[in-house]
Design a protein with these regions (language model features):
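Compact nucleic-acid interaction/catalytic patches
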Residues: 3-6, 10, 14-53
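C-terminal terminal-subdomain/extension
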Residues: 57-103
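Generic secretory/membrane-interface signal
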Residues: 2-3, 52, 62, 91
Length: 103
């Protein structure tokens, strides 16, 4: 499993959050058995920096819900559906900085 890979949500909230994107680098994930993921939401309002829109290949646009970031066991992430584009990857760090940065 690679950083920025997109997986179907294995949890119960699949209607509102059909996908999860892995943001943790590969090195850490192989040592911990978990990955840090950000939910990709449907029916959510995009908040410019904190919750930007991203494209899931073959599935359309979703909202990167950074405020719901969490860790999940790697064994629960199966059947990768794609990878975030370089443009969409570039939206993650500014979103994290906006949430945890000093202002």
């Amino acid at each position: 499993m690679a950083q920025f890979d997109i997986y179907p949500n294995p949890g119960q909230g699949k209607i509102d959050v059909p996908f999860l994107v892995v943001i943790q680098n590969n090195h850490v994930a192989t040592h911990t058995g978990t990955s840090i993921v950000i939910p990709l939401r449907t029916n959510s309002i995009s908040l410019e920096t904190i919750c930007p829109p991203v494209e899931v290949p073959g599935a359309g646009q979703f909202v990167l819900s950074l405020i719901e970031i969490f860790a999940i066991a790697n064994i629960r992430l199966r059947n990768r559906v794609g990878t975030l584009s370089f443009a969409d990857r570039g939206k993650i760090k500014p979103a994290i900085d906006k949430v945890i940065g000093e202002y």
